[in-house]
Amino acid sequence: EACDIGAELLLSHRVTSMERVFNSENQFTNWKIDGRGNEFPIECRAVIDASGVAGAASKILDMKTEVEVIAGFQYEMLDVPNDGYLDFYLWPKYSPHGYVWMIPKEGGRANVGLVTTDKKGAIKYLEDFIQDTYLADKPKVNPPWRKDGIKIKPFGGTIPISGPREITVDTGVILVGDAAGFTSPLFEGGSHLALWSGREAAQVITQAIAENDLSVKRLMVYQKAWLKRFPPYNKILKGKTALYDLTDEEMSIMAHCLPEELGNMSPLQKLGIGIKILFKKPILLTKRVIPVLLSFGYSRAKHFGW
């Protein structure tokens, strides 16, 4: 759709250098971008970096920010029962410091995958989960976008988990989505954040070009906007750390104390949950279960949806 209204899509192109061009008054005017591909070099007024977890612009321009990553892989499977819900499992046996998912799609198809801090063992954990559950006899297939004849294998990669990069704007450039580190550090969802940040960046860049001002100060409007909108990552990270300190039994007890919807709870409802936990397993309150519950609330789809 974007191409229909003027965008140009260049496949098999890889950026290797980005050079700022300045006028005689030392004011930034445009970019000269080079790389591997027939259309290079390319000149443009501004750059929105949506290069994913690699963060191309951040590395090429040495913006002095790094992100921690987690491994995420999934299979596409067939004949998977679909009750209309997404299944998520906090199951350390199969996904240390992560979780497993089953995301149903049309026609009995589903994406079954996991994220874990154990990047080398991720695919083995996924295979074990499928083999040990109701999915064992379900056929695996390659996703539609993969070429015919290729061996069936999981697809995925790394996902940023440490929160936003400290710097998401610079002269003439804005980082969005995974390139900016925008994923939930608890559940690693990032599609909602990528869509929101891409739209916000486009609006800010459009206005900045109209004003002929692509300075850091002008583009900082974007960074202020996401800082205001996104929930506090540091609180979610505290909750995540506390969550993975719980045993399987403690997680189950906590889950049975929760309502179906964690958002918009009144202070009285929150107190009620605390009382339930106190009676069922008092030690949970000493294991910082409250930050866990708060991080669940912050990580609802309203804020960090897929």
Question: Where on the chain are the PLM-derived regions?
Answer:
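Repeat-unit-sized solenoid/scaffold elements
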Residues: E1, V115-Y125, S197, N264-G274
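Conserved FAD-binding subdomain of flavin-dependent enzymes
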Residues: E1-D4, Q203
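Predominantly flavin-linked oxidoreductase catalytic cores and closely associated redox partners
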Residues: C3-P144, P160, R165, G181
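FAD/FMN-dependent oxidoreductases across multiple families
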Residues: R14-S17, K120-V204, I209-A210, V216-M220
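A general structural signal for short secondary-structure boundary/capping elements
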Residues: W91-H97, K119, A136-K140, D148-I152, ...
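A broadly tuned preference for mixed-charge, low-complexity surface segments
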Residues: K93-E106, G157-A179, W226-K240
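C-terminal helical "tail/cap" subdomain of flavin- and related membrane-associated enzymes
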Residues: T206-W306
